[in-house]
Each structure stands twice: as C-alpha cells, then as structure tokens.
C-alpha cells in the first residue's frame, strides 16, 4: 500500500508555470498514480497539503496506517525543511523523493535538497513519469 504525498503549490499544477510543470493538474497526476498502482497491483492513496505540519503528520503516521512505501514531492520544503527531513529519517518505510521539474537545471536555491539524503533515492525532471518510476521501484523492493 503506497502513500503519495505532494507538498506546497502542487495543488496548482496546470495553472502554475505550465512551461515548467506542464498543463496537467494534480487530479490528473493522482488518477495516473492510481492507474499505475492498479497495474502494479498496489493500492495507492494520494494526498496534498500546503502545510508543513500536515505533511509531517502524514509521514510520521504512514506505517501505523498500514502503508508499506512512500513517494514524496516535498515541493519547496525540499530545500529547507529539516523537520520534514527528520520525519522521513525517522520512518522505517522506504521513501522516494520525486520532482516533476529538473530542479538542478533551475534556480540555484533549488539545487539543494535537505530531504533527499534520507530517502532511498531521488527522481527529478521526468515529469509525472517520475512518480511511476518511484512506484515501480517501491513495488520491486517491497516484494
């Protein structure tokens, strides 16, 4: 059972910087993740919040809620949220960080991730396909 978390501003997909993030919406992404989950024979729950504390609680509670893996796009929290980093580090579940855009090809401040080091891996710049790759990886390691 996978938990897919999307952080701040990802509710604005399709509206915010379509040249960077594309024209598809968060709802489109969630539908795709659910379809990919069905192909992988894994149930998927998608959640989004603009609030750091809510994301922290979802990460902290994931295992006791029965989730076996976590895909997270922390949004801008990637670059400065040590609280989110610590929540991920304290989680026993495998976690993969995903970014729709290539953060290393963007502004300098986006090049640093404080969360990636405590994740199993980081996928960046592959659009929505990055979520699928993260899900495939988790399906493989959770077999």
Curated annotation (Swiss-Prot):
Matching PROSITE patterns: DEHYDROQUINASE_II
One annotated GO biological process: quinate catabolic process
Pfam family, one: DHquinase_II
Site note Transition state stabilizer, residues: 16
Catalytic residues (positions): 21 (proton acceptor), 99 (proton donor)
Catalysed transformations (reactions): 3-dehydroquinate = 3-dehydroshikimate + H2O
GO molecular function: 3-dehydroquinate dehydratase activity
Keywords associated with the record: Amino-acid biosynthesis, Aromatic amino acid biosynthesis, Lyase
Annotated pathway: Metabolic intermediate biosynthesis; chorismate biosynthesis; chorismate from D-erythrose 4-phosphate and phosphoenolpyruvate: step 3/7
Binding residues annotated for substrate, in chain numbering: 73, 79, 86, 100-101, 110
EC number, UniProt record: 4.2.1.10
CDD domains documented for this protein: DHQase_II
InterPro entries: DHquinase_II (IPR001874), DHquinase_II_CS (IPR018509), DHquinase_II_sf (IPR036441)
Domain of life: Bacteria
UniProt xrefs under SUPFAM superfamilies: Type II 3-dehydroquinate dehydratase (SSF52304)
General function of this protein: Catalyzes a trans-dehydration via an enolate intermediate.
NCBIfam families: aroQ, PRK05395.1-2, PRK05395.1-3, PRK05395.1-4
Subunit structure: Homododecamer.
Similarity-based family: Belongs to the type-II 3-dehydroquinase family.
Protein name (database record): 3-dehydroquinate dehydratase
Source species of the chain: Deinococcus radiodurans (strain ATCC 13939 / DSM 20539 / JCM 16871 / CCUG 27074 / LMG 4051 / NBRC 15346 / NCIMB 9279 / VKM B-1422 / R1)
